[in-house]
């Protein structure tokens, strides 16, 4: 087996579960809730960077890796937008404000917001719950607005009811100078007067210029066709970033669950 040459991006502290108190729960869509979590005495449980994730656990039920959807600039709490799709997430969706969970992390590489992305025009492309990891980056960029160029956000879902953080998108992001928001849903829906069509198709219809760096997250099949669409528009690989945490388990390159050849999603990704 080829030796992994990834850097050590964790410490002992990231391996120790920390108690988190649920202080707010927002019903985003019929099957997605956002959980606001703090340390028992208030404040964030740990520091993180945009794009990183954490292992969320309900003791006695199980644990899984979820993206941290809040920005590092938020010093009061961390947020996780979680889709109900299994035993653990069913249990998480049954919890109430005041309940406790455990969280360990952060894990995974972050988007290079302070290096490669700084000063660049940014294009965020998300599908469904894939907005959650990108929201951390988007809000970080908006909180440090002078450090970045123009921002385009292309976001789509199956229906208008499945658009996560729609109020924030319309009332904050869309009203921020230099930010352009493009929303779409897969099929026509009563009451929806916006664009109708799949994200990869809408991407090519808009025809974004190649003076941008693209950050992509969503269902694997969407990512595949979005990256192909970006290539058709003239984007090269160095201009495209995507995120993947579905295969991650330990988060530190030890369990081998997320390896692709000699690379590890959690550390090389």
Which residue stretches match the model-derived regions?
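Short, structured interface segments that constitute the first stable element of a domain
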Residues: 1-5, 211
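Local cysteine-cluster metal-coordination motifs and their immediate loop/turn environment
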Residues: 2-3, 221, 244-269
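FNR/FR-type flavoprotein reductase catalytic core
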Residues: 87-249
């Amino acid at each position: 087996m080829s030796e992994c040459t990834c850097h050590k991006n964790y410490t002992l502290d990231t391996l120790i579960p920390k108690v988190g108190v649920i202080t707010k729960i927002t019903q985003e869509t019929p099957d997605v809730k956002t959980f606001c979590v703090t340390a028992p005495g208030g404040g964030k449980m740990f520091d993180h960077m945009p794009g990183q994730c954490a292992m969320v656990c309900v003791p006695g039920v199980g644990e899984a890796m979820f993206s941290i959807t809040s920005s590092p600039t938020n010093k009061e709490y961390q947020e996780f937008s979680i889709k109900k799709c299994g035993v653990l997430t069913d249990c998480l969706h049954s919890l109430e404000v005041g309940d406790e969970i455990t969280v360990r992390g952060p894990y995974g590489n972050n988007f290079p917001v302070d290096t490669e992305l700084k000063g660049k025009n940014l294009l965020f492309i998300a599908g469904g719950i894939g907005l959650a990891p990108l929201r951390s980056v988007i809000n970080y960029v908006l909180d440090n607005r002078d450090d970045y160029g123009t921002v385009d956000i292309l976001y789509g879902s199956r229906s208008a009811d499945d658009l996560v953080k729609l109020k924030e998108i319309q009332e904050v992001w869309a009203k921020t100078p230099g930010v352009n928001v493009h929303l779409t849903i897969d099929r026509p829906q009563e009451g929806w007067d916006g664009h109708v069509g799949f994200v990869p198709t809408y991407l090519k219809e808009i025809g974004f210029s190649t003076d941008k760096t693209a950050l992509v997250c969503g269902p694997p099949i969407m990512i595949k066709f979005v990256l192909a669409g970006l290539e058709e528009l003239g984007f090269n690989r160095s201009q495209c970033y995507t995120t993947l945490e579905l295969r991650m388990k330990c988060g530190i390159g030890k369990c081998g669950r997320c390896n692709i050849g000699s690379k590890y999603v959690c550390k090389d990704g």
